[in-house]
Amino acid sequence: MDNSSPIYTEFLPISRADMEARGWDQLDFVVVGGDAYVDHPSFGTAIISRLLEAEGYKVGVLAQPRYSDCEDFKRFGRPKYGFFIGGGNVDSMVSHYSVAKIPRAEDEYSPGGIGGARPDRSATVYTRLAKEAYPDLPVILGGLEASLRRFAHYDYWLDTVLPSIAEDSGADLISFGMGEHQTVEIARRLAAGEPVESITDVDGTCYLTDFDHLPEKYVECAGFRKVASDKVAYAKACRIQMDNQDVVSGQIIVQKQSEKYLVQNIPAKPLVRWELDKVYALPYTRRYHPIYESMGGVPAVREVQFSIIQNRGCFGGCNFCAIQLHQGRRVTSRSADSIVAEAERMTHEPDFKGYIHDIGGPTANFRFPSCREQMLRGMCNGGKHCLAPTTCSHMIVDHSDYLKILRRVRELPGVKKVFIRSGIRFDYLMADPDDTFFKELVEYHVSGQLKVAPEHCAPNTLAYMGKPPIQTFNKFKDKFYELSRKAGKKQYLVPYLMSSHPGSTLSDAVYLAEYLYKNHMRPEQVQDFYPTPGTVSTCMFYTGLDPYTLKPVFVEKTAEGKALQRALLQYYEPRNAEKVIKALKMTHREDLIPLLVPAEGRRAVQRSARRAEPAEVTIHNDGTYTVRPNKGRGGRNQSRGTAPARTAGGRQPSPGARFAPNGTAPRKPKNDQQKENTVWKTSKKKK
């Protein structure tokens, strides 16, 4: 191995001064991103900007521009050919809001981890500002946020259906998917003088046109206005979109928006091995730009700085995952030499301590396409999955190539440990008759904890998630702990679990809580289902229908119902006791209360219930009254006071009147819940 591998230190220009330092008067392209500028291949802005640079273009990076006006988009002056824009690694709405729609204060992809550096719907806002700054310049919009909004889509934050982002943003082209092929071809044609309006035949792009200019052959799904008013039409459109995302079998899709028609060309071909190797060998500095140093850097770089991406795509088929509509289901991977060379280069970094945090990708242990048939016929459609509910008989299961790479990296001088943190697909691992990889995974590549994603255990919920049955996870779990014991290691599984996914009833959540209790599992982190654009699960959430069968699906949308399901996943927490008890009573599973609810939690709920019981007020003929609080308010203690004056006509207040224990009228209840908690009993003693 060549120990003279270069360490790259030069960032691309971020200002006019940087341009002038390179002797440039004008840029060819400006790449705009919603994240802080991190020159690392885990960041889309870094890949697109370095790729354009490698093609010979003069490129500047405009990271998290000010969005109050368009002046920041004029920072470099007018670019020669146009803008490439992305919203960031994470959807800006997910970055800004929790699933409960509560604003987040933190943003791992911004300087200092502080939120607010980008606008809501940043991809749309940036595109509009670029068009405002230079109305006649081409603007190509790509990245995750745009890819998942290329069709008319349900927007969870507004609780409505919106048209394609192509219409809303005013972009000339939408580049969906990973984008390298599209970027290079569009840049080449713009540089050759071709008007952007005529660039309508690039695979992996969408554009708006009128009816007279639609392509000759296409499949049409229901238009924006139809899917916004008809949930069956929305579900059918979702299936058409999902069934045409394969590079072999996919067809051009047309969907009418408000006025014009959106045309999605077939997906771009995935990068082949040598192309992936080239992309990941570009001169990334692998760091955040030094302008962020005084602000505490960019937190997101910490986990990826010494991590290696070895593959793209995922045939796992989880219905709640956006990878199918973005990266696609066809898996491609880098060569062993490329991965080892990147690892070797890391060992010369001044901050490297000997630990490579990850060699993985969307799913770490996928290296090749799932079967040979897909190369000829494409991936299976109609909601069929390679791994769920059972492993397809055509599946090629092989960890040997991945294992060879891990062994080579482990042997590099300066490397102490190589971890796998991006997620192991346990059902694929269990389908491998050769357990050599499993043994070495346990012995060498677990940093004390291994993250896995069973997500749930109820058969009904798992089916709607597109996940394998829980029995597969149980076998994996047992073998993991068995191999860990044999290796003399104390290691643990950290399961990812999800509540309130479409199809998950309260009974399903109770079933999951019982499973966790019986298996001595106490998840520290759980999440509610987050309905983001572009997934089958979000379609089910909005329509209440399975898009492949059109059969009804239960969807928990109430805040209380979601809270109960979430509490059951952490049943052992005393703070969740009241919700857990309520859920168990609602599902007639009171038998589980002594098991799932800690004694401390049960006592707290009992105290709370006693405090909520009404006190008894006795009014005496001498104008005084006595209050007998319930046991939670002091047991047998009594308090005396002076009753309010008699009303006109000499009548005592009606039996329904309310009194406070100190003899004064209580404050008016603020809401119905408080009203229920402040009811007082009154009784009048006879003379």
What are these regions (language model features)?
Residues V31, I47, R66-Y67, R345-V494, ...:
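Conserved SAM/AdoMet-binding glycine-rich loop
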Residues S68, E197-D246, E259, A268-L271, ...:
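Terminal amphipathic helices with adjacent charged low-complexity linkers/tails
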Residues S608-E613, V617-K687:
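Intrinsically disordered, Lys/Arg-rich low-complexity segments
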Residues D172, V279, C314, I339, ...:
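Conserved, mostly hydrophobic/aromatic
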Residues D35, M295-A322, T347, Y355:
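N-terminal pre-triad scaffold of radical SAM enzymes
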Residues D2-Q26, A36, V232-S307:
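N-terminal [4Fe-4S]-dependent radical SAM core
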Residues G44, A63-Q257, Q264-N265:
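Glycine-rich beta-alpha loop elements in corrinoid/cobalamin-binding modules
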Residues D91-A100, L148-R150, E180-E185, T209-H213, ...:
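Flexible glycine/acidic-rich beta-alpha junction loops that bind and position SAM and/or redox cofactors
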